[in-house]
Structure formats: structure tokens, C-alpha cells
Amino acid sequence: IQTKHFTLALNLLVALFFVTVLVLKKGYSYVPMVLGGISVIYALVYFFKFKQKWQLAKADKWLIFSFLFYFITFMLSIIINKDSFREIDNPSRILLFIPLLLLFSQFPIKIKTILYSVPVGAMITGLTALFQKFQLGYLKPFPEIMHIQVGNIAISLATYSFVIAIYFTVKKEYKSALFSFIGVMLAMSTSALSGARGGWVGLPIVLLTILFLYRQ
């Protein structure tokens, strides 16, 4: 497989994550699992077959350290409290981010993949939620997913889309900015329809911080 084809496939997977994160049941798990599996296989080939040395930037080292610290903290908590080791399942998944860093350093994700897939995902999520609520008569959108998760994921999509909208505004790409703002509104409507309130608590602080950082 050629490098450009492999890079394209990775970009499509990343875009697919934002588009399917709520639309599919456990959509937030499928793409990360596939990417995690690919990254582990690539890391094994990279280190043991080709015997390459990974040159880490300082920021990457701190990020990897934070992942390891997070995992070790959970491990110590389980050992001290004598909890079931099944509790380590979710925290252990964060370790998959380490080989992902290697994978994305060799096959970079294009910035446009993020800039457009996030608002598209926000819009698809919002339109699906509105259809389920007002056309299908669901009490809450995405009933197969816990409503707190739905609300928080939707707010995250709205926040990311808001940052992207500001970016496009600064770049004077106003059509793309409007597109992103529509994604913001639709994602926020999803969160509102879900009935979850947790994500809304920190939203004003996050938005004000973003505006402060982009004040120039």
C-alpha cells in the first residue's frame, strides 16, 4: 500500500469519527478502536522490523508522561483499594494514544480534515437529533446512548465547531465560518434535547476563554 493511500485512509477514519460519534451506537468507540489497532501494529513494525528510533519533541514527551501518569494513578488506586482489575479497562485505553502519536507523526492528519469533519459531524448529529425528536417522537434523541454522554459529546462538538468558526472568520473565509456556526447551533440543540445539563455548566467559561484567546 502506498504512503499517500494509507495517509488518505487515516484521514478518512479521523473524519468518520466526528461524523459517526453519536449517529451510530457506540460510534465513539469504533473508529478509535480501529485506529488504535492500526497504530499498535505500525509501532511493532516500526520498532522491531525496521528498528527505527522515535525522535520525540518535548511536547510529545510531556503528553506521553501525562498518559502514563493517568494510567499509573488508576492502577495504584485499584491496588490500594483492592478493587476489581476490570476497573482498569477504560483507563488502559488511553495508552493507545501513545502509538497513535507515532502513527500520526509519520502519516500526518491534514488540518482541513479536522476543520470540515467537525462541523459536518455537528450538523449531522443535530439534524438526526431533531428528526428523532420531532418526526419520530422520541422522548430524547439517541435513546440507545446514555443521555449524559449524548449531551456532553454534543457540547464538545459545538465547542470545537465554535473554535473552527472563529478560525475561518479570522481567515476571512466567511462561508466556511457560517457553515461552522450552523454546526454550533445544531450541536447545541442536540445537547438541549438530551436533557443533560453538565456540559452547559462549563460552556460559558470555555467560550469566554476562547474569545479571550482570539481577542486580537
Which sequence ranges carry the predicted segments?
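Aromatic-anchored transmembrane helix interface
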Residues: W62-I72, K82-F104, T113, S117, ...
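Hydrophobic alpha-helical transmembrane segments
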Residues: F18-K26, L76-N81, L103-F104, A187-S194, ...
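Alpha-helical transmembrane segments of multi-pass inner-membrane proteins
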Residues: S39-V40, L96, I109-G137, I148-Q216
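A cytosolic-side transmembrane-helix exit/cap motif
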Residues: K53-A59, F85-I88, P108-I114, L136-P141
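Juxtamembrane membrane-water interface segments that cap and precede transmembrane helices
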Residues: V14-F18, Q135-E144
